[in-house]
A protein has these predicted regions:
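A compositional/structural signature for long, glycine/proline-rich flexible linkers
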Residues: 35-504
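A periodicity- and composition-biased signal for non-globular, repetitive helical segments
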Residues: 11-12, 368
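Bacterial signal peptide processing site
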Residues: 23-26
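Bacterial N-terminal signal peptides that target proteins for export
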Residues: 2-11
Length: 504
């Protein structure tokens, strides 16, 4: 068929347009495919990012849980070290401080300015010393105490009391013993008793009872001065302790607990890991040690957060605050767990001094009463308010009554101590921080004794029975040293602690 010459150009144009349309359609299909491919890639990337974020959040949350447990676990060891630093950062013994390996002989009771240890007592004169057993043992000599009540509990780095020479256990005669560290083996001089410590760090926290009079202080000072400590290599030789080395970087003013609580997670766990090199965990701590390893805390090794997943480090950084809250909450939660008993607003425990794997219990005692004894030596009933929910308020007045013949049953001594909310003494015009069996109380007509707990004096005629309180929140702590184990006894429940009642 012959095409009209005029139609030929049109046909060619139409063919060209058809070809162009076909090419355009092909390009559109390619573009759509690319867009779809990019969208799929974006969705995949977002999904992967979300998965990574979810995984990071999971790691962070898991690390927070583990780090919180680790913080609680290590709290006693870190607190012991911070306490040691402050108490030994002097050239010579002075006041409540002294170099490593030298006795610190408290000549009077602590006062309201004392901030080295929480919950100090005003019943005994402390005779204490810090020892590093990593190089060699130390030998301690104690004079004849002439029947006076005393005890020399030794705390390892984790605050467990591993030995308690004293009137209850070894009598009051002269005695000599050696404190040896982990892994030490060798011979000791004849007549020297060995007390083996599980850790290189040891705090001998001796207490000698005193009535607080000038005459009795003098008698106790004479006994303190006869107590000696020498390294094994110097036994039987003339020995003069070297002056301590003062580190100006150590904060000597801020309370230990406050310093510990202010440590960030990185500093805290680095210190914990360093201390664990010479203060190894107990065998029973194996499950906890395995948990610590998951967040880079391994006994004998440095803690290096740069080797950890950033999400883990982020989770660990959040641990201090919830851990501190858990520790303080244990005063109430421990009642449910059976670690504390509650009577008439008083909480007390017979699970102190040795803790096993009760890490929260150990941390709480460290926080509010570092240096606590075994229950056979002392029980510390504590009350933060009439019912453990409502707090004591210094703007109000309270009375604690002992019925006739119902003062605390002990073979040692008892006392009632006033603390502020941070467990330190309260400044007052009488410089009185405790009431105890050494006080001459005014009795009621029926033979009972009322103790007045308030900020203002109850009147001159009642001041003998007055325990001064601050104007705000406060805490009461009783001490029953060498508590009776047979009726009447706090231990078996045959004696009850009187309640503290608010009065108008």
């Amino acid at each position: 068929m012959k095409l009209n010459k005029r139609a030929a150009p049109w046909i060619a144009a139409i063919a060209s347009l058809a070809m162009l349309a076909a090419c355009s359609k092909k390009e559109d299909t390619t573009t759509v495919a690319k867009v779809a491919e990019q969208a799929a890639s974006d969705v995949k990337a977002k999904a992967e990012a979300a998965a990574k974020e979810a995984e990071a959040l999971k790691k962070e949350a898991e690390a927070l849980v583990l780090a919180t447990e680790a913080y609680v676990y290590g709290y006693p060891l870190v607190t012991m070290e911070m306490t040691r630093r402050i108490m030994t950062n002097v050239e010579q013994p002075e006041g409540n401080r002294g170099p490593m390996g030298q006795f610190i002989r408290a000549r009077t009771y602590p006062d309201a300015k004392f901030r080295d240890v929480t919950a100090p007592n005003a019943d005994t004169l402390y005779t204490t010393a810090w020892f590093d057993l990593s190089k060699e043992p130390w030998i301690i000599s104690v004079p004849d105490m002439k029947g006076r009540y005393f005890l020399l509990p030794m705390l390892d780095g984790w605050t467990d009391v591993f030995q308690v020479p004293g009137k209850r256990t070894t009598g009051t005669g002269a005695q000599t013993f050696a404190i040896t560290g982990p892994g030490w083996s060798g011979e000791l001089p004849k007549g020297v008793t060995e007390y083996k410590s599980p850790t290189s760090l040891v705090w001998l926290l001796g207490r000698i009872y005193s009535t607080g009079t000038p005459e009795d202080y003098k008698a106790v000072h004479a006994l303190q001065d006869k107590m000696t400590a020498v390294p094994l290599s110097s036994w039987g030789k003339p020995y003069t302790p070297e002056p301590g080395k003062v580190d100006p970087a150590i904060d000597m003013k801020t309370a230990v607990r406050e310093q510990v609580d202010k440590l960030d997670a990185n500093a805290y766990f680095k210190l914990l890991a360093e201390l664990m090199k010479t203060n190894p965990p107990n065998a029973d701590d194996a499950p906890m040690v395995a948990k610590l390893a998951q967040i880079g805390i391994v006994p004998g090794q440095d803690f290096d957060p740069s080797k950890l997943d950033p999400a883990v480090v982020k989770g660990m950084a959040k641990a201090p605050k919830p851990a501190q809250e858990q520790i303080m909450a244990w005063l109430k939660e421990g009642v449910v767990a059976g670690d504390f008993k509650v009577e008439n607003g008083w909480a007390f425990t017979t699970k102190a001094g040795t803790y096993g794997t009760s890490y929260l219990q150990r941390a709480l005692v460290t926080a509010i009463g570092l240096g606590a004894n075994r229950p056979q030596d002392a029980i510390y009933p504590t009350s933060t308010g009439p019912d453990l929910v409502k707090k004591y308020d210094g703007s109000k007045k309270y009375v604690m009554r002992f019925e006739k013949g119902q003062t605390p049953p002990v073979d040692g001594f008892w006392s009632l101590t006033m603390y502020d909310k941070d467990y330190f003494f309260v400044d007052n015009p009488l410089n009185r921080y405790t009431l105890s069996q050494r006080n001459k109380f005014k009795t009621n007509a029926d033979g009972s004794v009322d103790l007045y707990i308030q900020a203002e004096s109850p009147g001159k005629d009642k001041e003998s029975n007055w325990l001064p309180a601050p104007k705000d929140e406060f805490v009461l702590m009783m001490r029953l040293y060498w508590p009776k184990e047979k009726p009447p006894s706090l231990i078996d429940g045959s004696w009850k602690i009187p309640e503290v009642k608010e009065v108008s």
